[in-house]
Amino acid sequence: MSKPVFVLISIVTAVAALSGQTAKIQPQPKTPWGDPDLQGTWTSDDTLGVPMERPVSFGTRQYLTEDELKDREKRVEQSKQRVENPSSDNHSPAKKQLDALAKGEAPAAGGRGVDAAPVPGQFGEFARRASRQTSQVVDPPNGRIPELTPEGKAKQAAARANRGKPATSWKDWSIYDRCITRGVAGSIIPVIYGNGLEIVQAPGYVAIRYEMVHDTRIVPLDGRPHLASNVHTYMGDPVGHWEGNTLVVETTNLNDKMGIGANGGGVPYSEDTKLTERFTRVSQNTIDYQLTVDDPKTYTAKWTIAFPITHEPGYEIYEYACHEGNMSLRNMMLAARAEADKPKN
């Protein structure tokens, strides 16, 4: 082979290789002021059915096999059917709920209807496509939440001891029952309803409005310091910055009333907790979301959950009223005290 031909083939091969690499990288949309554009309405619905912790039998395997995926796809389709035609399955939780309402029967305690199992699709939320993930936890590699510290175990024991006890004061009711918030993690970890969020951007700021309990976080991007260490709130103090196309949000100044779990459940974290979130838009309709928990008072190591949030045409975020006018707690306490004050026969 002559040298000119060799050089020509080499150039063509190199260009083809570069073209192939470029084709795999989708251009990231930008705002008019040049920031990566994450704006829109998104939902974490597709992670419904993926456990927080990986079953031990999976070991360090992060993704399902083809057969396992087919089984999950079958369950996703069943969830869709429950939503689209709830009266067709006489054994579904939704059908039991409809029958109970028709008979005038009150829902079971806990507000989850006559069947207490939180089945995806029971109240209208379902995964649109089956996830291959074996767990939401991706680090440590075994997909398991790290062991609790002695302080963390004490908090866990205290929370379990108080669960289900009669309430004599509004302080005895959980943050969940009082509909105050679900916290940073609980607002995006998918549950049986309310998994939407809307991202809005302006120069120097990102706002994240959650469907669950209508919380909104305003994230400044100007590098300001966090609030004083004696200030603590349910949603903490978020400060963000860009790392390439990734929005990184670091949140401190959290109170110790919430946990890292669905609806803000789980072991309450300490006031020294730092949460680091990463939002990376990987396609027109998908953002990769990561949340790293750094709380050495509660956990023996850092840990991370990750899952996609997707844009779904037609998904709307509705008002989250919880209990109308936020009066249910007051009314329940008044009624219970009136009942307790009745003369005994």
Could you tell me what each predicted segment is?
Residues 2-6, 18-345:
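PEST-like low-complexity, intrinsically disordered acidic/proline/serine-rich tracts
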